[in-house]
């Protein structure tokens, strides 16, 4: 009975969209790809961020994440995912003209890492905002260790057209204003994402193995594949498993996705609530900043989640402030592994499937999550990342066991309705084909990227590092053989130069003491009231 009621709402919304197909051409997509710079023997590059790539502080397309050696490439948000991937490929091709003898590491799990203290923390110059970004990263090192921060991923940003929400609200007799209805709809999408994201880990998880040194001798439940490689035989994404690391400070922080206000409120409390072990350390050691504050979270982005509600921020504005004042604008999917077989880590069929999947999450009925269902969602996710390919694996739905294969097949069939609409809107059958590709992985687990990684390593008798370096070299060769057209190369050169000039300007115009700047930044969050 429940399924038919839920399908009724989905069917009504599908009919409405079917009459407004043009709206589906206005969804926006953006991709962020992180990757380590490595030496030609597969070790972490300890060179500074190449100046030829511009300023990591002000270049909007090429920056660094945690480490000076961890690059992040950011595409613009565009309506056509094919153009987004073209942009991501262009960035890779440009970067390879500036890397010298270094490589971009192909998988999510890191290369052989140096001693913890030798992993360089990203530098952003002498402006107050640049220093703040550096101190925040020092705080992450203090709290979670540097090693964990070297894991890379793909972030997929997605928004539905703003004109869609009033249509849905009016058809359903809703009374919220445009902004609040839109925010509620995105939070509902996130609840459904929590319910169904285990499917993404099965289909796209690509990290069943890792370098033994990554665990630094910590206790673990992994098995030895060879002397230098740890793995789990049925794992899809060790990157998204706990790997024996727990954040005790964040353990009690489970933002409620029942509405935007409860979500922002829980994060606001966390960035304003001291955590005794951090208080004990303090913010300074030997006169140097070691963390921005001693609270559960230094800033909102420290909260680790698989998906985030987002709003583009104004200069100097904090993410929570933007969400509270203007509502949710898009979602950022953060649980995707980099596929080491793909030059940019993701391809068009994956993007097309993600679009249909996220559209399904947005339009399917999304009841509130109680504590029991919340725990069930987390358990299903963790089960799939550790043993998603185990034959006969069962998950839990409504408290009852259900075979992963049966549930995945049912979900893909339902997502197929959205793929059909997207194909009608865009012409062709690319979305339906993307779904067929994913269903084939459900039917045959050997087709999943995680199984392919293990098969390739076994076939070549390679360690994790050897396999990853071979893939990195293959991709490097492909990029270097395809230089950008001169005008595109020039455009990226200009972007890099302008970003360096912008950083220099910021540093020259800087007024005010850094301690006061941090104090004001901290106070900005405490001053917000609902």
From Swiss-Prot:
InterPro entries: Gln_synth/guanido_kin_cat_dom, Glu_cys_ligase, Glut_cys_ligase. One of its GO terms (molecular function) is ATP binding. The keyword ATP-binding applies. Keywords: ATP-binding, Glutathione biosynthesis, Ligase, Nucleotide-binding. Pathway: Sulfur metabolism; glutathione biosynthesis; glutathione from L-cysteine and L-glutamate: step 1/2. One of its GO terms (cellular component) is cytosol. It catalyses: L-cysteine + L-glutamate + ATP = gamma-L-glutamyl-L-cysteine + ADP + phosphate + H(+). Its EC number is 6.3.2.2. It comes from the Bacteria. GO terms for biological process: glutathione biosynthetic process. The keyword Endoplasmic reticulum does not apply. Belongs to the glutamate--cysteine ligase type 1 family. Type 1 subfamily. This is Glutamate--cysteine ligase. It comes from Pseudomonas entomophila (strain L48).
